[in-house]
Amino acid sequence: MNLISIATLVIITIGTCFNAIRWQRIAQREHYIPGYISKFYFRWVRSRGLNRFILFITLVLCIVSLFIAYIPIIISVINIYTPVGLSLKSRTSKVDKTERLNRVTYCYYFLVVLVSIFSYTLGYGYFLALAANMFSFFIFDQALRLMFNYEKNKSRPFINDASKKLNSNAIPVIGITGSYSKTTTKNVLAKILDESNNVFVTPESYNNRLGIAK
């Protein structure tokens, strides 16, 4: 590889790592379920004709990149700002930089860098790194999948302790499920029940098992 190709490889890798900002938000909001990052990505691509067009253009540029070294840099910049509508910055609540989110992000970084190292050492130039950039959502899903059992085992003591405390007290427990407005529904219901009962509400938007247990 010449210096231009190596520089391109490094820039692509940095761009792919930067994409973690977007995937972190989705991962946390969807309770770190493997596969949901890709699901949301394709949902946004299908939802707008502009996103479908941009995806088509980037795929064409990937072919062009076989002949022009700087094209992958353009692709990595495009992928930072797309899909349109699924922005890097949260429109509602901010991403909570928890230890779990940091761990899965570090795992993502490791996978991205590993792909780039393989791309270099196996003689593929920057092409494997470019593929990782195009499918960074899939790589983040793999990081979630790799960390899933570890996180499950790590959270089990907290969940078991919380379950014992609840079971040792003869009090009614209300759980609210759904895709949207769980926190709003929880707060409204708590306000109603508080008129004639002592009510304890889980703080803020901690709606997953570990968040509630802690």
What label would you give each PLM region?
Residues 5-214:
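Phosphate-binding loop of NTP-binding sites
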Residues 1-3:
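Short, strongly hydrophobic alpha-helical membrane anchors
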